[in-house]
Amino acid sequence: MPLSGTPAPNKKRKSSKLIMELTGGGQESSGLNLGKKISVPRDVMLEELSLLTNRGSKMFKLRQMRVEKFIYENHPDVFSDSSMDHFQKFLPTVGGQLGTAGQGFSYSKGSSGGQAGGSSSAGQYGSGQQHHHQGSGSGSGGAGGPGSQTGRGGDAGTTGVGETGTGDQAGGEGKHITVFKTYISPWEKAMGVDPHQKVELGIDLLAYGAKAELPQYKSFNRTAMPYGGYEKASKRMTFQMPKFDLGPLLSEPLVLYNQNLSNRPSFNRTPIPWLSSGEPVDYNVDIGIPLDGETEEL
């Protein structure tokens, strides 16, 4: 407590009061308002990308256009009336007709001139399979299965699913083959593949056609030419080393060192004390050091 003046305020009581107010308010209400959590839906993001108002949306649109160049979808509009002209050359030569309502083409074979048979298709996209129907009977054609229609001679491209047809020829049996091929690649178009031949339905592009022999090209790679050309290089080397006189061999004098260690002088310096007078003093220094490095004291 200070000696003079007003006493210091109680800070601890003030802070506890503030904490009580915060905790009391939290119990009464649902909680503190910390703001709204950021959430951006996917639709809002795509909408911003489609506005083309900033650089990012423009780059996204250009990327979509580049990607669409390399994407080919199996869309039913591929087999429209305008695109059927490109597939006419792939039809069989006998009794073939390309359908416009379904995805597929069919043809009929028989042993006599008159032909009659049913037709079918594989729905919207087709299945890429072959169906062989063979039967005998009288009449122009028959229909079987749910959702079937009456077959007509040589027609194809009907929209019935699971339709089969039977027919009869004058004095022989009829054979109806339907080939569903919803996609013909540009490679097959360029090579002139006939889809009615079963052998050519699956094509190995690596084994297609005869492999031509590689042409014998001349090599223009530079190689090192010997000095004087190849004519001189083919001859044997006639160069010989010249003879020269090395002279007599002089022997070096052999130097023999004295191996007696006891006769070697000692250059170890000994301390000389201060002299008190001018009288000469003789000091006898014992230099009889044993040759052995270890002594009895050690």
Swiss-Prot record:
<dbReference type="GO" id="GO:0042805">
    <property type="term" value="F:actinin binding"/>
</dbReference>
<keyword id="KW-0597">Phosphoprotein</keyword>
<feature type="region of interest" description="Disordered">
    <location>
        <begin position="1"/>
        <end position="34"/>
    </location>
</feature>
<dbReference type="GO" id="GO:0045214">
    <property type="term" value="P:sarcomere organization"/>
</dbReference>
<feature type="modified residue" description="Phosphoserine">
    <location>
        <position position="82"/>
    </location>
</feature>
<dbReference type="GO" id="GO:0140693">
    <property type="term" value="F:molecular condensate scaffold activity"/>
</dbReference>
<dbReference type="GO" id="GO:0015629">
    <property type="term" value="C:actin cytoskeleton"/>
</dbReference>
<dbReference type="GO" id="GO:0000122">
    <property type="term" value="P:negative regulation of transcription by RNA polymerase II"/>
</dbReference>
<keyword id="KW-0966">Cell projection</keyword>
<feature type="compositionally biased region" description="Gly residues">
    <location>
        <begin position="136"/>
        <end position="172"/>
    </location>
</feature>
<keyword id="KW-0539">Nucleus</keyword>
<dbReference type="GO" id="GO:0042060">
    <property type="term" value="P:wound healing"/>
</dbReference>
<dbReference type="GO" id="GO:0043503">
    <property type="term" value="P:skeletal muscle fiber adaptation"/>
</dbReference>
<dbReference type="GO" id="GO:0070885">
    <property type="term" value="P:negative regulation of calcineurin-NFAT signaling cascade"/>
</dbReference>
<comment type="function">
    <text>Myozenins may serve as intracellular binding proteins involved in linking Z-disk proteins such as alpha-actinin, gamma-filamin, TCAP/telethonin, LDB3/ZASP and localizing calcineurin signaling to the sarcomere. Plays an important role in the modulation of calcineurin signaling. May play a role in myofibrillogenesis.</text>
</comment>
<dbReference type="GO" id="GO:0051373">
    <property type="term" value="F:FATZ binding"/>
</dbReference>
<feature type="compositionally biased region" description="Low complexity">
    <location>
        <begin position="118"/>
        <end position="129"/>
    </location>
</feature>
<comment type="subunit">
    <text>Interacts with ACTN2, ACTN3, FLNA, FLNB, FLNC, LDB3, PPP3CA and TCAP. Interacts via its C-terminal region with MYOT.</text>
</comment>
<comment type="similarity">
    <text>Belongs to the myozenin family.</text>
</comment>
<dbReference type="GO" id="GO:0030018">
    <property type="term" value="C:Z disc"/>
</dbReference>
<dbReference type="GO" id="GO:0043417">
    <property type="term" value="P:negative regulation of skeletal muscle tissue regeneration"/>
</dbReference>
<protein>
    <recommendedName>
        <fullName>Myozenin-1</fullName>
    </recommendedName>
</protein>
<dbReference type="InterPro" id="IPR008438">
    <property type="entry name" value="MYOZ"/>
</dbReference>
<dbReference type="Pfam" id="PF05556">
    <property type="entry name" value="Calsarcin"/>
</dbReference>
<dbReference type="GO" id="GO:0005634">
    <property type="term" value="C:nucleus"/>
</dbReference>
<feature type="region of interest" description="Disordered">
    <location>
        <begin position="105"/>
        <end position="173"/>
    </location>
</feature>
<dbReference type="GO" id="GO:0031143">
    <property type="term" value="C:pseudopodium"/>
</dbReference>
<dbReference type="GO" id="GO:0004865">
    <property type="term" value="F:protein serine/threonine phosphatase inhibitor activity"/>
</dbReference>
<dbReference type="GO" id="GO:0007519">
    <property type="term" value="P:skeletal muscle tissue development"/>
</dbReference>
